[in-house]
Design a protein with these regions (language model features):
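Terminal transmembrane helical anchor/hairpin motif
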Residues: 112-187
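Helix-loop-helix units of permease transmembrane domains in multi-pass membrane transporters
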Residues: 17-53
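Cytoplasmic membrane-interface regions of multi-pass membrane proteins
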Residues: 25-32, 101-107, 181-188
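Hydrophobic alpha-helical transmembrane segments
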Residues: 1-24, 63, 179-188
Length: 188
């Protein structure tokens, strides 16, 4: 799971800058800047495309897992567990990655500078969380409390804290996007 999340992070890091700065890379910005459409429409459509990629990348492990289980002869599927784990618990984390990556790239407005700043942020978060003495989930962006599945009651009482933390971090990511959007300049 950790390797797959690292792979997802790299995809979001590179695709987010390409979606934001593609009009400048392809020199389409002269036409794009003359369009009478708000910046919000352009950026929201790019964000929605990244969320669509996140949904596809969350669905792939479920489909492959079901296929592998079928090939091994297992037919007792628990799709509610798959749905909760992937779409309710994992997908919001991917959306948080997208929000932070978008905010950084909107503020930096440079392809490689945005990559560098994003990587520094994520490496610092990982190092502080892994080697530091702090285990405070409200301090580290994207982190949520641990949870366990059980056969008797599923995720049980662990679901509510997960939902609240995901709401908290997505709200902070939206705030970062709004702040970055205030500094975003179109036409330059």
């Amino acid at each position: 799971s950790y390797d797959y999340n690292l792979f997802i992070f790299i995809i979001f890091l590179f695709f987010s800058v390409d979606t934001i700065l593609l009009v400048y890379i392809t020199r389409y910005n002269i036409i794009n800047d003359a369009m009478p459409v708000s910046n919000v429409v352009f950026l929201f459509s790019k964000f929605c495309s990244m969320v669509g990629i996140a949904i596809i990348l969350v669905t792939i492990p479920m489909v492959l897992g079901v296929i592998i289980q079928l090939l091994k002869g297992h037919t007792d599927f628990n799709f509610s567990v798959y749905f909760i784990e992937l779409y309710v618990l994992t997908l919001p984390g991917f959306i948080q990655m997208i929000l932070l990556s978008f905010a950084v790239h909107l503020l930096v407005n440079n392809k490689f500078g945005g990559h560098g700043v994003s990587m520094i942020i994520w490496v610092c978060l990982f190092l502080l969380r892994s080697f530091g003495e702090m285990d405070y989930n409200l301090f580290f962006y994207f982190y949520t409390p641990n949870y366990r599945w059980s056969d008797m009651n599923g995720i049980g009482h662990f679901l509510e804290p997960q939902l609240w933390f995901n709401f908290y971090w997505i709200s902070l990511g939206c705030l970062l996007i709004v702040i970055a959007f205030l500094f975003y300049q179109r036409g330059i």
